[in-house]
């Protein structure tokens, strides 16, 4: 499994498909726009979903037959017959010409040996509404990580975290509920279209943002379209827009981030699409 992908899948259905196809390796796949496919392993399949070609991050991705604008991308979810995998890993370890990579070595070899099958994600995805494409996000970049988090602030997000039939299990420490304090003009703790996690205390304004656990937003501050990781503290009179703040950072009083592209690029890391990443090391490097 890939550790930087977000999706809901019933693995039992993919496992059953693997057994039914009778191949040594099964790779989950999903249709993506051809332009986006350059960042993934891309495959070609026959009518029985046997993989006939596999290329890792191609400059010119092959298209899905009949769909010239789309490609079949690997989701980084593999099922192997155990003995086959152990034998292949030992063989690969002894190969001085191998890069020792699943996408570049193990999977392409399985394809050449006619031992690789594809599993369409639509057969095992969970929680997809009729007419809706299966939800799958690769969050391996700052932009995609920000996008996936901010998506959750929608009134009816594509990924439903409130689905009791298929909950997303994760470790959550025992923390007090989130708290919103003060009710004075210009000093009113509130959050609109936002996700606020346990242990957080809000006395400023939060709009369309995701706050992880134990975040503190002090009075007179405004947080918009931002993702704040655990134990972040936002001082007074701070303004944040389209920012990702790493765990444990303290933003000093009066700091403005996300409103001046040139200043942000000098102090922090700013992506081409305008998302600013702030880490403790970046803050420590700022002049006194």
Indicate where each model-derived feature is located.
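Conserved core of the sugar-phosphate nucleotidyltransferase
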Residues: 8-83
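Active-site acidic Asp-centered loop
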Residues: 1-3
């Amino acid at each position: 499994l890939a550790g930087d992908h977000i999706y809901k899948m019933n693995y039992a259905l993919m496992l059953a498909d693997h057994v039914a196809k009778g191949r040594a390796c099964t790779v989950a796949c999903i249709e993506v726009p051809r332009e986006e496919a350059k960042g993934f392993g891309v495959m070609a399949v026959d009518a029985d979903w046997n993989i006939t070609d596999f290329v890792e991050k191609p400059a010119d991705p092959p298209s899905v037959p009949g769909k010239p604008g789309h490609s079949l991308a690997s989701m980084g979810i593999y099922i192997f017959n155990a003995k086959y995998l152990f034998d292949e890993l030992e063989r690969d370890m002894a190969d001085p010409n191998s890069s020792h990579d699943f996408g570049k070595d193990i999977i392409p070899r399985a394809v050449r040996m006619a031992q690789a099958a594809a599993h369409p994600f639509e057969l095992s995805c969970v929680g997809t509404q009729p007419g809706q494409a299966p939800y799958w996000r690769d969050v391996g970049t700052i932009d995609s990580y920000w996008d996936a988090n901010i998506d959750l602030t929608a009134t009816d997000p594509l990924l439903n975290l409130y689905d009791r039939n298929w909950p997303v299990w994760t470790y959550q420490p025992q923390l007090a509920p989130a708290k919103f304090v003060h009710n004075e003009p210009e000093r009113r703790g509130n959050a609109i279209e936002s996700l606020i996690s346990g242990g957080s205390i809000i006395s400023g304004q939060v709009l369309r943002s995701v706050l992880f656990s134990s975040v503190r937003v002090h009075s007179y501050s405004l947080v918009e379209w931002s993702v704040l990781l655990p134990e972040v503290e936002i001082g007074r009179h701070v303004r944040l827009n389209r920012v990702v703040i790493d765990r444990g950072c303290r933003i000093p009083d009066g700091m403005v981030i996300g409103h001046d592209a040139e200043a942000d690029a000098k102090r922090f890391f700013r992506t081409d699409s305008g998302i600013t990443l702030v880490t403790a090391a970046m803050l420590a490097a700022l002049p006194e």
